[in-house]
């Protein structure tokens, strides 16, 4: 009777395996002790014959319970030390048995930390991990999907048939399977059968590499096989706060900076040409540059311009070029459009060797609905909120993370640490923070849910951001964490232990909008809008601000920076030079978007590359020269960066000359007596003898003039500098009487000796 029950149970389990409804295959497969012997069962769909080899002896199998369940009796526990010999369709092969590996990969401590949301290195357990142990070669798969009915690994190895390799469900909703015959480079997905019987094919949320779009499978990839050479850079970076140093950022999109011809293929190290990844149909016959080509071309370019950092728009894997990378499906993988993870690591390695930091745009606020992604991952709203009033951005067509779920927060926080630890990045810019902080963001009345206190704040998102920043600075004290936050949410750059969000920099969106609005006005009417220029100083010390002229301001009909400016071409260039120079002298760190450094004329288009041909023309060369010299001056003059976040570092001389649209101020730092005088003329009028007060008598050297001929200006200036004269103005007893060029910014430095 007992044997009949046992047989019926085995047949039932086999039936469930065949129909992808078994969440506990180890309960029946592999070696099992029964009546003093070891019954070893192998699941091998569509095999014609299976034999087992153990200790040089071959055991024939039978199929008493199911045509695909092959059984043999062994006289001792084979553990995982046996081979299965498979004949299928006239082709034979030998391998280890996936279900011989019964030990848990993710242990109790790992599960506990993950369930708490505190496993900061969860990527070392989740995903696909290659084992090169001589006794256990293969790949361990691990995925979190607590609501799934069953999960299988699918790929070329099993003709994408989920009946072949069912995974074992462990505690905490974690599923595991060791597959001996898979190797680096193999493509896989998870076939997830839901409780409702639906089948989803999902890419690995923790995958380290994915196929080039439009394909979306995950690729087995090694992680720890790169030889870093930047230890001194990392040590120096983490030894002190970076925000008290000069920071000048070149924001860019790798796929649209520069293209090459598809006929000009990238040659691999082994001499073989790499299949080109077409950039777009907009310019047929063009392809993306690879990470190695960007290493060769981009890094010297950025170094020559004098920027301290490169900011990359999202390079995490994403299916749609038109999302600019902001709709991520592969959170733990640099996009394969440009190459491999190791090639991207080499790009960062070389950046550090050339003294350039790397900042990544990070998008923890939302994710797309693509079927292979996180949406409805295991048949339930696992990563997102179920209620669209809190779980969906309808305007963007994306879903919002459920920050109240520990495992979801863990997925994101660990992802943040992953990029710093595995790829040695130096900073992040968190996109669309305002959309995370407010439940009613872009939502009409009645389409959002108040929080537990009746307010519109997303308290769970606040806690997540605080946790992410706290953990980041615990691990990497020299990191940059930059918030793109467009509202007046308080204490964005205050530490979490005093209630702040914990970022150390925030984009100054108010300054950006005010300045662009101001410079778009005809200069003759700017006298009525002087407050747009001066207002930013009134709140400058409420946060640690970064001034940014970003990609968002040069798309969707807004024009590129040069073409925002009024007037003829000469005035457009002069206005652009004046704005950039004023930006470099205003308190706050700096970020500009690619193309601004030479006066790009066309709007940025993600499917095109920059207008490099413009550099054949002198005015565009002039803008580039201006940026080169501004960055050099900026790094060499501590007054321009050392006290960015201290009121001591800035003092108005005169901000009330509205009739002339002229402002003047001082920049200084508290460790020396050196300081700079900055004077800006935002009209086309040339003032031959303009007086401003200064605190010290003596000689003031003109160290920068945006109207210089080198920059494409009229070259009106002050013959290298000016001596003070005794004249009471602006509450000072000394004055400079200077030539003030049209649409320009001039910088003077007090000299102890001429």
Swiss-Prot record:
Keyword Glycosyltransferase: yes
Catalytic residues of the enzyme: 431 (nucleophile), 484 (proton donor)
GO molecular function: 1,4-alpha-glucan branching enzyme activity; cation binding; hydrolase activity, hydrolyzing O-glycosyl compounds
Keyword vocabulary terms for this entry: Carbohydrate metabolism, Glycogen biosynthesis, Glycogen metabolism, Glycosyltransferase, Transferase
Record-given protein name: 1,4-alpha-glucan branching enzyme GlgB
Gene: glgB
SMART domains: Aamy
Entry keyword Transferase: yes
Subunit relationships: Monomer.
Matches recorded under Gene3D superfamilies: Glycosidases, Golgi alpha-mannosidase II, Immunoglobulins
Family named by the database record: Belongs to the glycosyl hydrolase 13 family. GlgB subfamily.
Highest rank taxon of the organism: Bacteria
Catalyzed reaction equations: Transfers a segment of a (1->4)-alpha-D-glucan chain to a primary hydroxy group in a similar glucan chain
